[in-house]
Design a protein with these regions (language model features):
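N-terminal basic, Ser/Thr-rich segments that initiate or prime the first beta/alpha elements at protein or domain
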Residues: 1-487
Length: 487
């Protein structure tokens, strides 16, 4: 593995696509969208487009030609750069995870993409965009074995190691297709889908004939309220179906496999992805229950771990169970991460804290209602309907707030829109703080906060208006054994 190797030639095409994606909006704004071009010959625009395309293709080829990788002296070494030569040496013991994915183009040529990530990186430290699956598996196995102080010297030993890993691994969770549809339908992806569509369309506002659209819209309004309502419902239903299908495609064939040292998560229909997570890098578990799933006894579970990159938002919090029934949750956690076994029974916050949750909602609500009543009278009076909704929201936040200590585990539960339960090992906690305002002090309440490492940032659990003596119990539980460096 010490001989420099290049990526598969299809990496040239991948580089071209990447460059086009990065330049598409500036290209449309500067070249394609018509503007004031009096006096400029008509052949200039096609010439500019042709030059840009040639530059993109040439740069993509040179990037592929100048990119090499190899394994040497306990390091993964990459050399790249068209004009300025860049050398990146990554020590094996700094590697936190290796993520194998298969895009549509890679799958056509039986290739994969390998991301190698270290702690504290803002992006993947090494990206091999087009290599064979056997090479990716060989790199993964070799680095894992080297990190465990075992050095295979030949192909036979590599195969023995692979067989041993296969024998020790077992599939502990698999999301079924009906469960995936239920997960997608209750995920709230519609809002993300709509916002993405609006953001995309807004980039091309000069190309959209708004005057014609609005003229047609005026004619459309004359068709009546019923037709308008029906049209809006059909449009929302179409967006909902598209958002649901996109989630199902993204998480299709979701499987969790555990070995002695790692958790391997694979998923995807069009783009297959396999993420390998070292168990000793896991910092905590986060359980999320949104407004739809909680009444149904369903939850989504994430792993917080000291890895990932800012470019890949998914790698900061890894989805362990996309959708699982709460009654089966502890059994599955016991199979995968037995150190996080807990009954999740919480100590609730005191009843006198409820008034503070309601009070905080009214601090925001009163100015809003006042403005609506003042500027939109008489329809503004309908804003008073927000009062019972605010009280109900405050009660839900109060009801779902709590804490628990079980051996070396701290559990903090709270709600903004979705209920979050953060399970943390004492040795992984970076800090615990509690503070109290003058108003909290009058009622002997305080706010407790605990943080763990998650990617290059921190994941914070916070519960407001906890009994002050309970905060002191949590602080004293944590103080004797300070959290160790999780890296």
């Amino acid at each position: 593995m010490s001989d420099p190797k290049r990526l598969h030639p299809i990496a040239v095409l991948l580089n071209i696509i990447k460059s086009i994606k990065e330049l598409v909006i500036p290209f449309l704004l500067v070249v394609v969208i018509p503007g004031k071009n009096e006096g400029i010959p008509g052949w200039i625009q096609p010439l500019v487009i042709a030059i840009i395309i040639l530059l993109i293709i040439g740069n993509a080829f040179l990037q592929w030609l100048r990119f090499t990788y190899r394994i040497e002296e306990g390091e993964f070494r990459i050399e790249s750069g068209v004009f300025v030569r860049k050398k990146r040496y990554i020590k094996f013991d700094r590697i936190h995870s290796m993520d194998i994915s298969e895009g549509i183009i890679q799958r056509v040529f039986s290739l994969v993409k390998l991301n190698i990530e270290t702690a504290g990186g803002s992006q993947a430290d090494a990206v091999l965009s087009a290599i064979s699956k056997s090479d990716a598996d060989r790199i993964n196995a070799y680095i894992s074995e080297e990190k465990n102080a075992y050095n295979p010297f030949d192909r036979d030993k590599d195969e023995v190691a692979d067989n041993e890993i296969t024998a020790k691994s077992s599939s502990v969770f698999k999301q079924t297709l009906p469960q995936l549809f239920a997960m997608a339908a209750t995920s709230g992806a519609v809002g993300v889908f709509l916002s993405g569509a609006v953001a995309f369309i807004s980039q091309f506002d000069e190309m959209i004939p708004f005057k014609r659209i609005f003229k047609d819209y005026e004619d459309f309004i004359e068709m009546g309220t019923f037709i308008l309502t029906l049209f809006a419902l059909v449009a929302l239903l179409a967006v909902y179906v598209l958002a649901t299908l996109s989630m199902v495609i993204k998480y299709a064939s979701f499987t969790v496999i555990k070995t002695d040292e790692e958790i391997v998560i694979s998923r995807g229909l069009l783009e297959k992805r396999r993420l390998t997570i070292p168990i000793h890098k896991i910092q905590g578990i986060r359980i999320m229950e949104n407004l739809i799933r909680k009444p149904l006894g369903l939850a989504t579970v994430y792993i917080e771990y000291a890895g990932g990159s800012m470019e890949d938002k998914e790698s900061l919090s890894i989805m362990l169970f996309p959708l699982i029934r709460k009654k089966h949750l502890q059994k599955k956690i016991l199979e995968i991460l037995p150190v996080y076994e807990t009954d999740t029974e919480m100590t609730p916050i005191p009843k006198r804290a409820l008034s503070r949750y309601v009070f905080r909602k009214f601090l925001y609500l009163i100015p809003i209602i006042g403005a609506l009543v003042w500027f939109f009278r008489p329809w503004g009076y309908l804003s008073f309907l927000l009062v019972p909704l605010a009280i109900f929201w405050a009660y839900m936040q109060y009801r779902d707030s709590g804490w628990s200590i079980e051996g070396n585990l701290l559990l903090l539960s709270s709600r903004f829109f979705s209920k979050q339960t953060l399970i943390m090992q004492r040795s992984r906690i970076q800090s615990i703080t509690y503070k109290k305002s003058w108003f909290q002090n009058r009622k002997e309440l305080a706010t407790i906060t605990a943080s763990i490492k998650s990617g290059i940032t921190s994941r914070v659990g916070m519960v407001a208006d906890v009994e002050e003596k309970d905060c002191l119990i949590i602080k004293s539980w944590y103080s004797p054994k300070k959290a160790v460096d999780s890296q």
